[in-house]
Each structure stands twice: as C-alpha cells, then as structure tokens.
Swiss-Prot record:
Gene3D superfamilies: Nucleic acid-binding proteins. Keywords: Cytoplasm, Initiation factor, Protein biosynthesis, RNA-binding, rRNA-binding. GO terms for cellular component: cytosol. This is Translation initiation factor IF-1. HAMAP family: IF_1.
C-alpha cells in the first residue's frame, strides 16, 4: 500500500488502553483503536486521555489507526497555532 492511500484525520483520545493503544474519537464522531507511530514510540512521546491527535487510517480498515502527531495547545500545525 502506498502512502498516498492513507486517510489523515483529527481526533481526541478518550481512553488509554493496555499495550500502547488508545481509543480515539474522531472529529466526525467515529470511534476507533489507534496505536502510536514508530518515531513517537522511539522518542517516548506521552499521550494522555483528552489529548488532540492526528492519525492515519487505511481505507480498507477504518476501525484501526496510527497516531502520528500529538497537538499541544498554542503550538504545532493546525488552527490552534499562535503563529
């Protein structure tokens, strides 16, 4: 599967599950199970319930996703940026 086929979405973490998995509610209301991407795991980026995240999903399985970015209020890309 090529990277062009991935769907990028925004959501918020509603529950922290065992084994580095998270229950995420997307902005459109859909819920799915997501895991942290490789670089986030490598650099020990901590994700807590209530955090806003960006994630990638495969168009073939919309019940799973990979968290690629944790948004902090006032920093990073997105509408909440102060730049």
């Amino acid at each position: 599967m090529a990277k062009e086929e991935l769907i990028e979405m925004q959501g918020s973490v509603t529950e922290v599950l065992p084994d580095s998995r998270f229950r995420v509610t997307l902005d459109n209301g859909h819920q799915l199970i997501a895991y942290t991407g490789g670089k986030m795991r490598k650099h020990h980026i901590r994700i807590l319930a209530g955090d806003k995240v960006s994630l990638e999903m495969s168009p073939y399985d919309l019940s799973k996703g990979r968290i690629t970015f944790r948004h902090l209020a006032g920093r990073g890309p997105g509408p909440s940026s102060s730049r």
